[in-house]
Amino acid sequence: MLRSWIGSGTLRSLCARRLTRSSLPSPKASFSSAPNRYLQPPTSADRVPLRKQLKQEAKALRSHKKQRKETEEASRQEWELTVGVEIHAQLDTEAKLFSRAPTSTSETPNSNVALFDLAFPGSQPEFQIATLLPALRAAIALNCEIQPVSRFDRKHYFYQDQPAGYQITQYYEPFARNGYVDLFDYDGIAPEDGERVRIDIKQLQLEQDTAKSQEYPPSTQLLDFNRVSHPLIEIITMPQIHTPATAAACVRKLQAIVQSCGAVTTGMEMGGLRADVNVSVRRRGEAAGQHQYDGITGLGQRTEIKNLSSFKAVEDAIIAEKNRQIEVLESGGVIEGETRGWAIGSTETRRLRGKEGSVDYRYMPDPDIPPLIIGEDLLSRLRESLPTAPDALLTLLVGSEFNLPIEDAKPLIELDDGARLEYYHDVVDILRSLQVDRDDKTRAGLARVASNWVLHELGGLLTKADQAWDAEVVPTRSLAHLIDHLQRKLITGPTAKQVLATIFDGDHRPVPQLLEEENLLLRPLSREEYIALAESVIALNPQMVEQIRSKNQLGKLGWFVGQMMRTGEKGRVEAPKAEEILRELILG
């Protein structure tokens, strides 16, 4: 072990004696060449403090890594990345796509299965019309052109999770085409993409989900067919994305849109939505590549990364695959069209199989399912009933009615499938009714105050307890009454937080009753009491008082305010009044 460390040129401390690089032989020297040297202490000229030497080595290593990173980054700038996204989302329906079996996947394995789901001979598909409605809502929300006539096709492949040997999808004539999604800087797109990017959507198609497989090494694999024929929509974007961050932002935005219109069950975090990404690179300034995808020409050979289950995985996998392809091309290699995988925490993608083409899947129209005909009257009704889109909600929340910062508005929209936003609106409505007697300026700020309590104070308690969102834990009326008391200065901020935690822990008493019974209502101090308390704190810290007076260090007044709140009776000292008295006594 010692020989290998010496050979690598890296010093290690194996005993209390401090050895230096100069006291060791060169990497090429053998132990037998100078056996007595290891028994001699280093000379004063050779002696270097170990801590200093380690710092120098660490500094040199950081410098080397920085130079290498800058060199690699310069090389990366020579290449253009192109990404297309495919999203598979489970539709929120009670029945499966082509059978009457229920769609619940949390039941006992293989308990919600029809004969057609298992491909029993003679069983026929029965298209469940209710599955079309959430799919249409998603297509309308994504600005798609709904096709009056669409058809189903068979995509043939053989795998244990697909008992029929084919998947029913809409390859040739999908039900929706030519949509788009707009991404803004607040969506998290890359700075180099500017303030806004429009990503075109090629098509939306209905298709079956597959069985859920669970592997038990070395040779056992269990299959749960409850998920077979669960209705999916596949959203296919055009290959117009050129940065990993924007690709992740696109997936995030698409999820937010299909969730906001009630089309899907859950998002990525719960397994209801999966993303595949197609990645290719080409050198800038060179002749256009020879590949074309979805009508866009001049691209490099693409690879597909399957089943990405988080936004971070989307971004990280694209970065890793981009770097891999560049390294292959710069070393004179050729990119193969293939399907690759990505594991969380990994630094590189891995090959799964060669990439199949449409010929390999042997697409053919399904002869057992008639064409799907969609009337304009149905579309008109759905458009009228569609909820407000996320971008419109954001505009509303940051506008004059609510005046929220964008940092608060976005989480309210995105958290808990819209449940947090609904809760927030209820709190604001109740709070405004309680504060109807207040002036306009006070009432105008209520929405921002409420967002702080819903997101940060209540959200913090949920995070600390590792608890999922539940609107009943702290009823909207309780939170509104608590904020009302705080705004009227009937309680202090610390008291309000204490009461919120009490309600969160299960106290169901109405807020006014709780405050009265626990003696938490603010009993304001008189001016004389404030002065006496301030004088006692000042007397204990004469040096700090002198610094405030002579050096104008007004920031230290806040420290005195804190001392007054700590030493005074709990919940009775108001910070603004305490600071006012301190300024009078210290500054005159």
Swiss-Prot record:
It comes from the Eukaryota. SUPFAM superfamilies: GatB/YqeY motif, Glutamine synthetase/guanido kinase. Its EC number is 6.3.5.-. It catalyses: L-glutamyl-tRNA(Gln) + L-glutamine + ATP + H2O = L-glutaminyl-tRNA(Gln) + L-glutamate + ADP + phosphate + H(+). It is found in: Mitochondrion. Its main location: mitochondrion. GO terms for molecular function: ATP binding; glutaminyl-tRNA synthase (glutamine-hydrolyzing) activity. Residues 22-50 are annotated as: Disordered. Residues 22-35 have a biased composition (Low complexity). GO terms for cellular component: glutamyl-tRNA(Gln) amidotransferase complex; mitochondrion. Pfam families: GatB_N, GatB_Yqey. The keyword Cytoplasm does not apply. Residues 1-109 form a transit peptide. Keywords: ATP-binding, Ligase, Mitochondrion, Nucleotide-binding, Protein biosynthesis, Transit peptide. One of its GO terms (biological process) is mitochondrial translation. The keyword Transmembrane helix does not apply. Subunit of the heterotrimeric GatCAB amidotransferase (AdT) complex, composed of A, B and C subunits. Allows the formation of correctly charged Gln-tRNA(Gln) through the transamidation of misacylated Glu-tRNA(Gln) in the mitochondria. The reaction takes place in the presence of glutamine and ATP through an activated gamma-phospho-Glu-tRNA(Gln). Belongs to the GatB/GatE family. GatB subfamily. This is Glutamyl-tRNA(Gln) amidotransferase subunit B, mitochondrial. It comes from Penicillium rubens (strain ATCC 28089 / DSM 1075 / NRRL 1951 / Wisconsin 54-1255). The lineage of its organism: Eukaryota, Fungi, Dikarya, Ascomycota, Pezizomycotina.
